[in-house]
Amino acid sequence: MKQDHVNEEQSALWNGPSGRAWVDIQPSLDRLFEPFATLLADAAAASSARAVLDVGCGTGAVTLEIARRLGADAQCTGVDISARMIDAAHERAKRSGLRVHFVCADAQTHAFVPASVDLIVSRFGVMFFDDPVRAFANLRRAARTDAALRFVAWRSALENPFMTTAERAAALLLPDLPPRRPGAPGQFAFGERQRIAAVLSDSGWADIAIEPVDIGCALPEPALNDYIGRLGPVGLALQRVDDTTRRRVVETIRNAFEPYVQGADVRFDAACWLVSARAPSSAA
């Protein structure tokens, strides 16, 4: 970690159990979030960008899809705090034969080459900074004048009941389950439009647009047990309980997800923000 101990909690999480889980069930998660990879890749393909930075790239799905769209002369780089996920991204890149670059680093503090990219994207990767203004100011320095910023982030927990189903169903069986802290780094840190606007404005971005989007997503039904048992606050809590409790919790949560099961898939609508902004000149 950096000497000022930035994002230590998130680094421990994503270099530990959460990172392992994402790597292990990567194909299912890729399918779950594929509509958002397509959304960002479409935006990249419609732009004139030739140097793209994917923030919080995870195992590389978005970075690789953009590289496919833009062709061999584009420079596509993914950055993530999780060494385990970056290792998986490197392996995917080798198999794909695509020309991409992955960096294990904290985008909040990493010394990016100044004015080196003309498009910055992120699929659910920018809600985890402990100082988001500092993070987006750092990304702004990496951007060339008039570079575009495009990212998707979750709207509020209230608007995303699927994402809190496990916590609500397990609450009585896991009384020590930590509550989500409003505004804290995590999935719903950017749930409020006003906060996103303030963060981007305070960090030097211009022409900010924040659009609500609702997109249908699907998870293969056989992957539901891993989704329940390994991801999110419940997944972390289940590592600390005995086998009997774990079985009871998973069974209870699976029953709570039944309304979302449609044949071979688990389906839900994701309530998100599609955010765009522009990097003004340093003199602006």
Each model region followed by its residue ranges:
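Conserved Class I S-adenosyl-L-methionine
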Residues: 3-4, 13, 18, 25-26, ...
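Class I SAM-dependent methyltransferase SAM/SAH-binding core
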Residues: 51-110, 134
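Conserved hydrophobic residues forming the short capping helix/wall of the S-adenosyl-L-methionine
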Residues: 70, 93, 170, 200, ...
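Helix-to-beta-strand junctions that scaffold the AdoMet/dcAdoMet cofactor pocket
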Residues: 71, 129-130, 143-145
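Conserved catalytic/acceptor-binding region of the Class I
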Residues: 133-134, 140-141, 148-219, 238
